[in-house]
Regions:
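Gly/Ser-rich helix-loop-strand patches that form or flank binding pockets
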Residues: 79-129
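Acidic, proline/glycine-rich short linear motifs
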Residues: 21-64, 166-168
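A charged, well-structured terminal subsegment
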Residues: 151-163
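Short glycine/serine/threonine/alanine-rich loop segments
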Residues: 31-33, 88, 118, 162
């Protein structure tokens, strides 16, 4: 069976750590590895970001394979591009970060989501628990790409015995 691949964009905030914990909890169930991605702005030194990301990964107690990745670019393009390159099934992203992404709310979060054909699980400041997700909300239109994402939602809902709410 092919190992699934998840992406967790990480800005070194506490909510990014929570997104990582959600990804780990789900990855254990579906046999996935996790690429943890930090995007550094153009002209910035990546060595400190690499060190911070490696420190986070080494301090995370996980049975799941965590792979550090640092890219130079911007979050609006690079998260989606990276997910496509890695053939990711899901992106787990925290919102309301306090450092690099302090403005990832509202339309900025939507820009990141819209830049990718890979489905997102958006988390806030609630940690993952063993029960998974009681409710999953799926915004749905009738284009082909959106319909394809329903298979991933169905898998997650089956694993966690979640109730799915479709919004059109």
């Amino acid at each position: 069976m092919k190992t699934k691949n998840f992406i967790v964009p990480h800005d070194f905030s506490s909510v990014a750590n929570i997104a990582l914990q959600h990804a780990i909890a789900t990855a254990k169930i579906v046999n996935a590895e996790i690429n943890v991605l930090h995007v550094v702005g153009k002209g910035k030194d990546i060595s400190e970001a690499e060190k911070q990301l490696n420190d986070i990964i080494s301090s995370t107690n996980s049975e799941v394979k965590l792979i550090p990745n640092v890219r130079i670019g911007n979050i609006f393009e690079d998260i989606g591009d990276f997910a496509a390159e890695k053939h990711a099934e899901l992106i787990f992203m925290g919102t309301h970060g306090i450092q690099g992404w302090q403005h990832i709310t509202g339309s900025n979060a939507l820009k990141v989501i819209n830049s990718s054909k890979v489905p997102f699980i958006i988390v806030q400041e609630k940690t993952a628990d063993d029960d998974g997700y009681q409710n999953i909300i799926v915004p749905l239109d009738l284009n082909k790409e959106t319909k394809q994402k329903l298979a991933v939602v169905a898998d997650i809902a089956t694993y966690f015995k979640s109730k799915v709410h479709v919004i059109t």
